[in-house]
């Protein structure tokens, strides 16, 4: 999870398994006022997902003031007939006495089915969230094997790990102007060779990502490689390339290559 808002670009399924429960968490791109074709596609993707789920979780940051973006989404919830649970995350960053006023503030704006304060980082109250969700979900056979934790491919996870490191290490200009594509993966018995392309829309962003004497991209590669090796369980050789594609977020060809071709009208 990135600390920077609105950086999710794809629907990501995370599967929670216990002996008698399977819950599929579907993380969608954040709904926002779109300024380009990519933004419109991400919004459409998020809205399409609503039809396929049983419960909506509205995740917000309890440590920041309720803002225009929150109110924009709450206004959209008026047309939703499914249960909507508000999750106030990052309660570890505020005082206990601030939690109830925060709950009351949101309660005045929408009749949430539940409001649950948690700290995902500290795992505070997350067990309660699971118990509440179990009460809202229908009985069903498991969709996934009990050992499965995500439906995402290795190629997608690798590109997201690289993009995550870019977001962690660069300034606020970069997040919405970068995407990563895993171009090639070659497996051997003892190692994996990976080539990943980092795409930005301006030349100065390429310079930021490469850094002085290539120091930034080396650090991005080092951190990403460590996580990829943990993911895949093998030695990884990671090659990172940076390419400038002006206005790529308005170019249907590139957006289609990212897997969004089903969301164009």
Locations of regions flagged by a protein language model:
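Short beta-strand-centered segment that lines the nucleotide-binding/catalytic pocket of NTP-utilizing
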Residues: 1-14, 26-28, 233
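Flexible beta-alpha connector loops of hexameric P-loop NTPases
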Residues: 1-2, 31-39
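Conserved nucleotide-binding/hydrolysis micro-motifs of P-loop NTPases
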Residues: 5-7, 29-32, 62-66, 91-94, ...
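Solvent-exposed alpha-helical segments within well-ordered globular domains of core cellular machineries
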Residues: 10, 14, 44-51, 68-75, ...
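Conserved, well-folded catalytic cores of nucleic-acid-processing
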Residues: 15-19, 34, 49, 53-56, ...
């Amino acid at each position: 999870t990135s600390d920077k808002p609105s950086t999710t670009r794809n629907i990501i399924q995370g599967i929670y398994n216990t002996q008698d429960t399977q819950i599929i968490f579907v993380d969608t791109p954040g709904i926002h006022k779109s300024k380009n074709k990519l933004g419109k596609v991400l919004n459409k993707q998020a809205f399409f997902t609503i039809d396929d789920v049983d419960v909506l979780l509205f995740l917000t940051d309890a440590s920041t003031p309720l803002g225009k973006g929150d109110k924009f989404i709450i206004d959209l919830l008026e047309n939703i007939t499914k249960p909507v649970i508000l999750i106030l995350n990052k309660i570890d960053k505020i005082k206990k006495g601030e939690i109830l006023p925060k709950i009351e503030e949101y309660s005045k704006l929408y009749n949430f089915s539940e409001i649950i304060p948690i700290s995902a980082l500290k795992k505070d109250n997350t067990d309660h969230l699971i118990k509440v969700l179990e009460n809202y979900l229908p009985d069903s056979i498991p969709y996934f094997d009990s050992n499965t934790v995500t439906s995402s491919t290795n190629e997608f996870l690798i590109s997201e790990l690289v993009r995550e490191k870019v977001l962690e290490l660069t300034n606020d200009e970069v997040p919405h102007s970068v995407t990563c594509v895993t171009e090639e993966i070659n497996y051997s018995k003892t190692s994996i060779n990976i080539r990943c392309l980092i795409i930005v829309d301006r030349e100065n962003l390429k310079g930021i990502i490469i850094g002085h004497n290539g120091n930034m991209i080396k650090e991005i590669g080092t951190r990403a490689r460590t996580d990829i090796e943990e993911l895949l369980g093998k030695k990884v050789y990671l090659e990172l390339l940076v390419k400038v594609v002006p206005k790529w977020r308005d170019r249907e060809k590139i957006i289609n290559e990212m897997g969004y071709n089903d969301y164009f009208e």
